Amino acid sequence: MGVIQGPVRVRFAPSPTGYLHIGGVRTALFNWLFARHYGGQFILRIEDTDEKRYVPGSADDLMASLRWVGIEWDEGPDIGGPHAPYVQSLRYEAGIYRPFVEQLLESGHAYLSFTTEEELERMRAEAQARGVKAFRFRGPERDWPLDRQREMAATGRPYTVRLKTPTEGVTAFRDLVRGGERIEFKNEELYDIVLVKSSGMPVYHLAHLVDDHLMRMTHVLRSDEWVASTPYHVLLYQAFGWDPPAFAHLPPILRQDGRGKLSKRTDDVAANRFWERGYLPDAMFNYLALQGWSYDGYTEIMSREELIERFTLDRVQPSPARWNPEKLLDMNGIYIRRLTTEQLVDAMAPFLARAGLIGNPPTPDERAYLLQLAPLIHERLKELGEAPELLEFFFRDVTDYDPQALIPKKMDASTTVAALQAARDRLASLEPWTHDRLEAELRALGEELGLKPGQLFGALRVAATGRTVAPPLFDTLAALGKPRTLRRLEAAISVLAAAHAEVKGQS
């Protein structure tokens, strides 16, 4: 890309029609990185002109999702700015779009169309019956004088405002993601799109373009699904006599199997779902930056500062990116392991509180205990949301032992009960209760009993935690403390002895 003249201004303009799709976060991120790389401004604008699909509260949700990832805006609905308001419905109510509609009508670049939806459906069906592959509507009113159009409107007949597209020649633009390649559309293959609905509300094609011009956008970075609409936008810029911004259409993100794009309807791709599951903002930021962009083909872990410094559009690939949840999970694990113990405790505390294991916020004693527990799972953790399940037995008693899980390989119930009783007796007098003393005593006990470490330690692990997989045994016992460890050994011995007695009684 050539040298950029003047301050860069870009925007992310989502529609509040539900949760924010992770692909939308990627689009916002690319805009944000582009603005920050060139020292420009990133603007957030809410495009809520589709009344039928509007979902109350979704604008707040999408702003929260962006802020969670670490994307802040320089101007926007909640912080204002020199071009406020930044919500299209409010701009419509303020009458911002009306003079531009009049300008298009007066210049002959738009017209009032009185064709109803029912008539359009009939025309489509008739065209299909004739074997027409693509129905391209051009209303008869496009050739009427404006006075005649206004006279018809004065009778009360509903109408829309449509763009009067040319029927000859081509409309073209250059795309920065494709190296400035010139993309052409034959005008004869266009149709007269609606600019203003019968309700008077401008549609996306008109509203976003007027807003981009008034807000002085220099570049438009958006999904490549808008490539087919761009010739209409170019025609509108020409009709107004405005210079268009530079266009950059970003590659889609495909499902992991490559079969189609990520979809709100069929894929678990709500940005807030990753927040809820315990993905770190820095990990998500880093991973999304690599969805369609690459620095050198192999460097993947990059800080925000490095991404800002390195991000340019000539490194955005026009070919589709592919979503890889396993790679994202691994990257999240890398970022979790980079946290200090204190940072990990702060990060996982809300998840433990939500599970009812600690208070919100944690008490000083709870926080001190978490500082002891966090190192036990730090290396294993890939989602913060896993922390409650991994740590639950430290906060709640084990109540449902599986007798079979208590019995190690090549041992039976009787020998396991004897081993656990011996461990209980040895540990009852152990002081101090530390990792090193626990390890020394239990290893010595195992040798005395003629057991392999895996046998004794396996039985002790299940007795202490109720699980076959848990953090390192001696760290776990040290963190549980002596009284709780001894109580759990007693409980496990009782469960296993009772199960053994029942089996003997049946034989």
UniProtKB/Swiss-Prot annotation:
GO BP: glutamyl-tRNA aminoacylation
Motif extent ('KMSKS' region): 261-265
Residue interval(s) of motif 'HIGH' region: 14-24
Intracellular or extracellular location(s): Cytoplasm
UniProt GO cellular component terms: cytosol
Gene3D superfamilies for the chain: 1.10.10.350, Glutamate-tRNA synthetase, class I, anticodon-binding domain 1 (1.10.8.70), HUPs (3.40.50.620)
Similarity-based family: Belongs to the class-I aminoacyl-tRNA synthetase family. Glutamate--tRNA ligase type 1 subfamily.
Function: Catalyzes the attachment of glutamate to tRNA(Glu) in a two-step reaction: glutamate is first activated by ATP to form Glu-AMP and then transferred to the acceptor end of tRNA(Glu).
Protein name: Glutamate--tRNA ligase
Organism of provenance: Roseiflexus castenholzii (strain DSM 13941 / HLO8)
